[in-house]
Amino acid sequence: RQVQGIFDDQEPETRSYWNYPDTGFWDPERNTREFVAAMSEWREHGLLAITLNLQGGNPRGYSRDQPWYNSAFGTNGSLRVEYLGRLARILDRADELGMAVVLGFFYFGQDERLRDEAAVLEASDRATEWLLEQGYSHVLIEVNNECDVPRYEHEILRPHRVHELIQRVRDLSAETLLIGTSYGGGSVPGENVVRASDFLLLHGNGVSDPERIAAMVRRTRQVPGYRPMPILFNEDDHFDFDQPRNNMRAAIGEYASWGYFDPGANNYQEGYQCPPVNWGINTERKRAFFHQVRELTGASGREAVIHP
């Protein structure tokens, strides 16, 4: 989970929270530049996919209030050109490296920045159209992050209606994009989402027992409407990579992919979510994760396919 690759903060009162320690100010272009520079090392370890979100994730990791303003959309659903520029650099590099990107559209800490449901629909349409115009074929759409979190202000982003948005993106893309949504830690997708989705996204936050992770995958396959499709944990804040049984191995043992969520501490060292982020493999926890990825994938360190 590296959703802050295009992060910025348009709120003057909080922008200084993310200042780099060496310069004393926040720089969104530097953030993306360093993200892109780190991608080949991730790929060399066998990593095949990353996650981004057009409204990011919580830059504090976990907090009740989210006063910052990080959104690739204007209040009316228009697209912000500067965000698209940063996004294109990451998507282009991922394509060069043979990596997929799970791209989220909306996040519950920022969806209120869109003034009404019409703006949400406009934002979704414009983001989808932009992806189609660019011709990207390695991007999967997560229409929103954790649709069952009660903080969503727009009904169409909540569990009982989010399938409508999934179908809207599918129709607009003429079924050329793969689309789904994710649920909060420990939750299993609802039937309406299972029937509408091309792949299913689970979260392991709050699930400390690897056996529960395995059970979540099995339960998901029992939801009415399920047919063979990829199941992916794109967020889990449990590690234990030195243990023979951990959440990552439990998910993979059920033929589900697993996503590493390491929030960090806004110190340009720890984690991959709280800015300013050091996107390198620079801590013991990051090294432990990537070591396990390399072990499980059999990567030799020469897998990156880099085109001129």
Descriptions of predicted regions:
Residues 122-123, 138-140, 144-291:
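Extracellular glycoside hydrolase catalytic/binding regions
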Residues 6, 25, 75-78, 260, ...:
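Intrinsically disordered, low-complexity regions
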Residues 285-308:
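Carbohydrate-binding surfaces of carbohydrate-active enzymes
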Residues 11, 274-275, 307:
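Intrinsic-disorder/low-complexity coil detector
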Residues 31-35, 103-105, 127, 213-220, ...:
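Generic hydrophobic, helix-prone segments enriched in Leu/Val/Ile
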Residues 1-199, 203:
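Active-site mouth of glycoside hydrolases
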